[in-house]
């Protein structure tokens, strides 16, 4: 989707072209790759992989230039064939959501801790054998999914994360899940005592849940990966439009307190979120 600005940043277009070239894809234009959201000429959301929103294509590798997508907020690259990720990916310091489940990953970049804005990191259903020590630097992390890998060891630094190790959210999603691994001895204390240490999600149910999350991000009404005054205006317009009922997506994104009504309370919640950030 576009925000009305028909200009595309050449750096971002170059990255998309690099992805097409390195994977030998038969795609004529970079803006036809997967699903994309652009804001002020920059790519803010990118979905690509063997799923509907991803264009039903399979990537095998990523170019080093992926780290140049400096405004990217949301990246869904599940259902691909990645074995490793380029170190340059850790330059994506504005990235909030990173979903790389259902790949073949055996490791993560050592400097993943540089991705300081990450809230959601999903590495489920890969072949990960270890986690980098720097994982503990991700102080904004709320969700960490590492289930169904080949992990036998986790660094103690993981306990630096501000995660509710035992909890589930309002959609019954666990904040943490590490089931389906080989985690037995000498575990970090936060993991050893976690009620979610054996938590995993069945692939069929998992796919449904993530699709819902993919399409509905609370307070982000224009789905650009940023919560700002544009979203406040969108809520006001919904409230003022007395002739039409809000769509399911509008309710999902704008009803911040989940009381099934969109009103001034939701506007205040968005304003407070912007101020806090």
What feature does the model see in each segment?
Residues 1-61, 172-175, 179-219, 223-224:
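N-terminal capping/linker segments that flank leucine-rich repeat
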Residues 57, 80, 100-103, 126, ...:
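Consensus "Asn ladder" position of solenoid repeat domains
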Residues 40-41, 68-71, 90-95, 113-118, ...:
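Leucine-rich repeat
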Residues 213-277:
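Cellulosome-associated attachment modules in secreted, modular CAZymes
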Residues 44-49, 75-77, 95-100, 119-123, ...:
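Conserved hydrophobic beta-strand positions in leucine-rich repeat
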Residues 59-64, 68, 76, 80:
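Glycine-rich active-site/cofactor-binding loop and its immediate structural neighborhood
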Residues 65, 88, 111, 134, ...:
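Tandem-repeat architecture and repeat-register "anchor" residues
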Residues 62-67, 85-88, 108-111, 131-134, ...:
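The feature encodes a structural signal of leucine-rich repeats
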């Amino acid at each position: 989707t576009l925000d009305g600005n028909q200009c595309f940043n050449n750096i971002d277009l170059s990255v998309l072209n690099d992805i097409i070239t390195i994977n030998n894809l038969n795609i004529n234009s970079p803006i036809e790759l997967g699903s994309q959201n652009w804001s002020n000429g920059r790519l803010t959301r990118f979905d690509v992989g063997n799923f509907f929103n991803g264009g039903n294509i399979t990537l095998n590798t990523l170019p080093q230039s992926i780290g140049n997508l400096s405004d990217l907020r949301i990246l869904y690259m599940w259902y691909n064939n990645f074995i490793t990720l380029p170190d340059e990916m850790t330059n994506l310091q504005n990235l909030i959501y990173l979903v790389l489940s259902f790949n073949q990953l055996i490791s993560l970049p050592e400097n993943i801790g540089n991705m300081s804005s990450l809230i959601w990191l999903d590495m489920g259903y890969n072949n990960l054998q270890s986690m980098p020590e720097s994982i503990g630097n991700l102080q904004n992390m709320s969700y960490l999914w590492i289930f169904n890998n080949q992990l036998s060891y986790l660094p103690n630094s993981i306990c630096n994360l501000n995660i509710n190790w035992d909890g589930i959210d309002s959609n019954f999603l666990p904040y943490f899940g590490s089931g389906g691994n080989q985690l037995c001895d000498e575990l970090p204390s936060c993991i050893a005592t976690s009620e979610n240490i054996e938590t995993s999600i069945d692939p069929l149910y998992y796919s449904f849940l993530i699709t819902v999350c993919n399409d509905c991000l609370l307070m982000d009404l224009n789905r650009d990966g940023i919560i700002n005054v544009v979203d406040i205006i969108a809520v006001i317009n919904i409230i003022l439009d007395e002739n039409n009922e809000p769509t399911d997506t509008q309710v999902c994104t704008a009803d911040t307190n989940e009381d099934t009504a969109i009103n001034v309370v939701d506007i205040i919640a968005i304003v407070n979120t912007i101020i806090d950030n």
